[in-house]
Amino acid sequence: MTALIKTSQSKISDTEITILDGKISIPKDYLRQKAFLDDTSVLIVSGSLIEGIGTIHSDIDCIILCDQRPNAHSIKGVEHAFVTDMNYRHITQNEDVHNTTDFYGDTSIHIDADYITFPEIEEIFEKIEIAFSEISSDQRFLYEPILTNTENNVIHRSIIGHALKNEERFNDLKSRIPLEKHIYVAHREKLPVFYAFQDVQGCWQSGNLWMGCEIVRDMMLKTTMSFTYLTGTTNKHYKWVYSNMYRIEGFDEIKHKFFILARQGATTEIECRSYI
């Protein structure tokens, strides 16, 4: 079976960032000019294109770590396609800026920048520490994620990212990420609950097999994501599970079986029971 998964190389030099095997280059100064930075700010460039799993329609993700977010008036002199608040709604007044979006030249690449304060980073670290201390000695199911999607993105993008301003401060902060604890918590979050297996038993016995196929498929995807976390992956978005599995070194039998089952269809009763 040929895995229809594409990866690419990215490079970061002293002056520019090159993505998609050299097809597109973005000057570092362009990213610096688009961000609102003060002397203490840390500018991080990151995202799936930096990882090498993004496509020509993916985005460059930037994080600006700051003491305080800029307000709308502060960034008036910089042209952006979108400026949004914490709920990603367009800003219409002089509010705090949480995110900006820009489109790079005549490419399909867009650049997303999130403003995150240093106290918020510390709160994320604390959340991970507390969650780990609470679950590391028991077997409870985690029905709700510990971190929000934004908080997970901050951790992941900090781990794979590169600093374009205040690199020393970034390296210090990065060294304090409780990475192994974060990975363990992520692993526990994705483990399927026993009640889902009971649903599968019910579907099997009643003949509700299309539903049963969907439940076991969801369980397989979650278990696979959990597995990728244990290998060191911190990208938690569903859509990257194939790329994450593809890039894992070793475990060829597990990877091969996953790719077959993930792409396998089932319509008839025999096919559905075989799949389940």
Predicted features along the sequence, with ranges:
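Helical scaffold of the NTase/Pol beta-like nucleotidyltransferase catalytic core
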Residues: 1-45
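Conserved NTP/Mg2+-binding pocket subregion across the NTase superfamily
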Residues: 3-19, 85-205
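Short, solvent-exposed loop/turn segments at secondary-structure junctions
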Residues: 50-51, 118-119, 234-235
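Residues at beta-strand starts and edge strands
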Residues: 58-60, 107-109, 273-274
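Active-site nucleotide-donor binding segment shared across nucleotidyl transfer reactions
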Residues: 30-73
